[in-house]
């Protein structure tokens, strides 16, 4: 049957409970396996699961979001803490992905709620950001705190760490690729707040230095590149990591690699065995950031990623078919804790405004 029409779901009904037959059935991509005696409800459930599954999931998801819509709206209005906003964001990301395949169009409803959340969150950040900068002891986890509060405690505990930063990688994109790693890893997720501006030259330098940009400029002027300079703004990341390790009086051995293309990714895969003697290995993956810029500048990519769902799909395809997944596979089982994070995300602009001025205008 599969040879003639591989898309037809096949349900096997048998008396046999032999494991070898079960394995053979699973290996031949059987849709379901029922052992006699079988009651009518079992048959009905199997048919529904294989024939009407997508319709049932779509209907259930739509009803679920309609019920949750009001609760999320109340949560947006009542959010007073950084943890509250993290929960709002996680819920919106969850429903955005769940509604992706819904046959009932709910995207406008979700987009409206995301806009409402963005407006309220902007006011929240405006009200609290200065306090976060002036009082680091009471602020949420932010870019300069990642190494101090997440990486160093693991290293101090005797763990070895791979710190993999995927540039411009959003939570919804992480959720899109997470299942590809489930076979090799268990997960402990948490969110953090990027500094402002969230642009790479500020946010990522802040992560690797453990400092705010102004502090980097004052303490290490030779490692800071001004906004109006033609020089690359993220060329000193390895030295910044070194300064942070020395500032906290650690003696960890570390490596740093930035992957721009598949050729360098292959090179990195080849030297993984030589990296295993380091206590800390830092890897920056740039593809997602390149993809986000191409979505603006390249017509073909713009067509391929014209919706957020399509953008996530492209991210998954890259993760699965590039050397990135292979990198995670090779690290797995080598005694390393792996931290996957990002420096910032991206927002798809629906109503652009053209601003004309000198390139140094802020």
Residue ranges and their predicted role:
Residues 158-177, 207, 281-284, 324, ...:
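Beta-strand elements within well-structured catalytic alpha/beta cores of enzymes
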Residues 3, 16-32:
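Alpha4 helix (beta4-alpha4-beta5 surface) of REC/receiver domains from two-component response regulators
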Residues 20, 38-47:
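C-terminal output helix
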């Amino acid at each position: 049957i599969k040879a003639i029409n591989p898309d037809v779901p096949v349900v096997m009904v048998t008396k046999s409970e032999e494991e070898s037959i079960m394995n053979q059935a699973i290996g031949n991509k059987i849709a379901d396996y029922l052992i006699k005696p079988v009651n009518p409800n079992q048959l009905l459930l199997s048919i529904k699961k294989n024939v009407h599954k997508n319709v049932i999931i779509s209907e259930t998801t739509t009803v679920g979001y309609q019920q949750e819509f009001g609760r999320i709206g109340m949560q947006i209005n009542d959010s007073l803490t950084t943890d509250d906003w993290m929960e709002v964001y996680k819920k919106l990301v969850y429903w955005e992905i769940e509604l992706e395949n819904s046959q009932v169009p709910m995207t406008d409803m979700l987009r409206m709620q995301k806009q409402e959340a963005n407006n309220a969150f902007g006011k929240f950040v405006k009200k609290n950001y200065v306090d976060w900068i002036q009082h680091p002891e009471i602020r949420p986890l932010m870019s300069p705190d990642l190494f101090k509060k997440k990486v160093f405690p693991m290293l101090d505990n005797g763990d070895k760490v791979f710190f993999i930063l995927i540039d411009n990688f959003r939570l919804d994109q992480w959720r899109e690729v997470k299942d590809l790693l489930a076979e090799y890893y268990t997960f402990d997720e948490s969110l953090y707040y990027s500094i402002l501006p969230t642009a790479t030259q500020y946010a990522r330098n802040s992560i690797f230095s453990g400092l705010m940009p102004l502090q980097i400029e004052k303490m290490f002027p030779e490692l800071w590149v001004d906004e109006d300079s033609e020089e690359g703004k993220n060329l000193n990341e390895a030295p910044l990591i070194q300064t942070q390790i020395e500032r906290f009086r650690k003696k960890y051995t570390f490596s740093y690699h930035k992957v721009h293309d598949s050729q360098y990714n292959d090179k990195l895969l080849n030297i993984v065995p030589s990296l295993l003697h380091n206590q800390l290995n830092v890897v920056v993956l740039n593809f997602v950031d390149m993809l986000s810029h191409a979505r603006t500048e390249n017509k073909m990519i713009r067509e391929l990623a014209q919706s957020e769902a399509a953008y996530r799909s492209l991210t998954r395809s890259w993760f699965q078919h590039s050397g990135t997944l292979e990198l995670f596979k090779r690290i797995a089982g080598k005694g390393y804790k792996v931290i996957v994070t990002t420096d910032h995300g991206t927002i798809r602009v629906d109503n652009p405004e053209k601003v004309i001025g000198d390139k140094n205008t802020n």
